[in-house]
A protein has these predicted regions:
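Short acidic loop-to-helix transition motifs that present clustered carboxylates
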Residues: 31, 51-56, 78, 392-394, ...
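Thiamine diphosphate
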Residues: 98, 106-119, 226, 328-329, ...
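Conserved structured core elements
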Residues: 5, 28, 223, 230, ...
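N-terminal alpha/beta PP-like core and its mobile active-site loop of ThDP/TPP-dependent enzymes
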Residues: 2-339, 381, 472-475
Length: 582
């Protein structure tokens, strides 16, 4: 390796070392020189329809491969992406946002140039991003540029959240030392003197538990403890649930897995069992209202051991600066030697289950009270499944997942439209892993997207990117004439919850899909059975799209149905009192 290289070459070499194979984005005059170095560095350039979609796609890519990256231009481009960057921050996707900026001379002279507020101020956009990224750097000096890049990327890895790198156009080809590339970016976790004390208290709680259970949340992925948590579940054989965010990270085929815990919305026997537990091992908590069924699924603190990034809570006592991965690894080793609570007989607790078409009249119209447990039969090992914010996001929580599957479901940010470009990014990451034989031995892996019509209209352009890259994506579009999730919450008869009626199955052709690309529509169970039985849909390649037509008030069982029922009950009460409410 030469002793020096161009700054852009250094940046892209580092990204390749982190496992990044593709960079998303949109070209703009302040990043064009930077883009010249993407493909020579061995990276694939993915040009998206707009910067928002590019950032969504980089997020989806990051959740599968660990790190994603996008490049935008200064001002207009980066602000278009910032909503998605905020979502990645909230739900902990490690996205590197690289922004091409005006030359240093223009910034220093405060020139009034395009893509600015025309006031000579160049730092506002970076200040905005400081609120939604964990580290930011503006490269100004070739002598310090490589260290700045490494420091920011280290924080991206350590915290699994977005970072922000500004590259002035006049620094792109500046020579920098290459020596640092000979070593990977070093990660240093704090080691607390109290590790043994924490571990001893955890072991004591586990040994004395009489009704223990396990609750797994989605932050085990960025924490890097998915494997350890799975081993703990396997060894203890204790009843296990996930939150919506945690679903899809575990092996759901084991007998002690019971699906998503819905708190007060769950079956009475499940809610009672959790409430009566004397120990809850909670891994990777992300306790937002939308991830905990309005906070009702949060376990009682006094019986909970909660494992977060660098903190363990044992009951109401908090131990800070604790390396959680080390603790969970120690726990895996110790469990085999402990006398654990063994459920014999095992408690009678419901598990997720599929439905069969044999149990349903094929002439009946589709309805979401049964749809999702039937669609579960379509899923294959290794599928990446995405359920968009809306009825689809609630529905996919009901689906038992096969081995090695992943699930993206609404968690906290809930920006509708995310899942379509997110599916593009996830499918691309999936293909890169299969091509390098790193995907569980599966060769024909699929990405399966469930999305409502309203969300689809937000980001439909990324069908074109999926088609251009020939990604293996199956799209199930829920056509319910608008925002049914909003109808359930408020205004179920109001026009503001309607959307334009599109001919959705013409979209693949419009966006350039090859002639013969599969599209199909189902209104009845019989029509859906025929579609799901098609080899072309199940085992084909490239884009396939299926429209599922349901009623405008149709929703999966659970909170949405209850919200709608309460809304209608209030309306009946208002009418009985001689008033009228929407």
């Amino acid at each position: 390796m030469a002793s020096t290289m161009k700054l852009a070459e250094y940046l892209f070499s580092r990204l390749r070392q982190l496992g990044v194979g593709s960079i998303h984005g949109v070209p703009g005059d302040y990043n064009l020189a930077l883009l010249d170095y993407v493909e020579p560095a061995g990276l694939r350039w993915v040009g998206n329809a707009n910067e928002l979609n590019a950032a969504y796609a980089a997020d989806g890519y990051a959740r599968i491969k660990g790190v994603g990256a996008l490049i935008t231009t200064f001002g207009v481009g980066e602000l278009s992406a910032i909503n998605a960057i905020a979502g990645a921050y909230t739900e902990r996707a490690a996205v590197v946002h690289i922004v091409g900026t005006p030359p240093r001379s223009s910034q220093d002279a405060r020139l009034l140039i395009h893509h600015t507020f025309n006031d000579g101020e160049y730092r506002r956009f970076a200040q905005m991003h400081s609120q939604v990224t964990v580290a930011q750097t503006c490269l100004r000096d070739p002598r310090t540029g490589t260290k700045q890049i490494d420091d920011v990327l280290r924080e991206c890895l350590r915290q699994s959240r977005p970072v922000y790198i500004e590259v002035p156009v006049d620094l792109v080809s500046a020579l920098v030392p290459s020596e640092a590339l000979q070593q990977s970016i070093q990660m240093e976790d704090p080691i607390a003197a109290s590790v043994s004390d924490v571990f001893d208290q955890i072991v004591h709680k586990i040994k004395s538990a009489q009704q223990p259970l396990i609750l797994v949340d989605g932050e085990i992925r960025p924490m890097g403890i998915v494997g350890e948590v799975q081993q703990i579940i396997d060894v203890t054989a204790w009843p296990t649930w996930t939150t919506p965010f945690g679903k899809g990270l575990l092996n759901e085929t084991i007998p002690n897995f019971h699906g998503v815990y819905q708190g007060s919305y769950d079956a009475p026997e499940v809610h009672a069992f959790v409430q009566q537990a004397d120990l809850v091992l909670c891994f990777g908590p992300h306790f937002s209202s939308t991830n905990t069924y309005a906070f009702s699924s949060i376990p009682q603190p006094e019986v909970t051991i909660a494992f977060t990034d660098h903190e363990v809570k044992v009951g109401t006592k908090t131990f800070r600066d604790v390396p959680t991965k080390a603790i969970t690894s120690m726990l895996v080793q110790r469990l085999n030697t402990l006398e654990l609570k063994r459920y014999d007989p095992y408690p009678s607790l419901p598990r997720e289950h599929k439905l069969s078409f044999a149990d349903i009249d094929g002439a009946d119209s589709l309805s979401q009270d049964r749809l999702w447990r039937l669609l579960a039969n379509f899923l294959q090992p290794g599928d990446i499944v995405l359920g968009e914010t809306g009825t689809a996001g609630y529905g996919v929580r009901e689906m038992p997942l096969p081995r090695h599957s992943r699930l993206f479901t609404p968690v906290t940010w809930l920006s509708i439209g995310y899942m379509l470009p997110g599916a593009q990014g996830a499918a691309l990451a999936q293909r890169e892993l299969t091509e390098s034989s790193q995907y569980f031995g599966i060769e024909n892996a699929r990405t399966v997207l469930f999305i409502g019509d309203g969300s689809f209209q937000m980001t439909v352009q990324e069908l074109g990117t999926i088609i251009r890259l020939n990604l293996n994506v199956v799209v199930f579009l829920i056509n319910n004439d608008g925002y049914t999730i909003e109808r359930c919450i408020h205004g179920y008869r109001q026009g503001y919850n309607d959307v334009s009626s599109w001919r959705y199955l013409m979209a693949p052709s419009f966006f350039g899909a090859p002639e013969g690309t599969y599209t199909g529509s189902a209104r009845t169970w019989g029509e859906l059975e025929a579609i799901l039985g098609s080899d072309e849909v199940c085992d084909g390649r490239g884009l396939r799209m299926v429209e599922l037509v349901v009623g405008p008030e149709d929703a999966p069982k659970g909170p949405l149905v209850q919200f709608l029922q309460k809304q209608k009950a209030r309306e009946r009460t208002s009418r009985s009192w001689g008033t009228d409410t929407p």
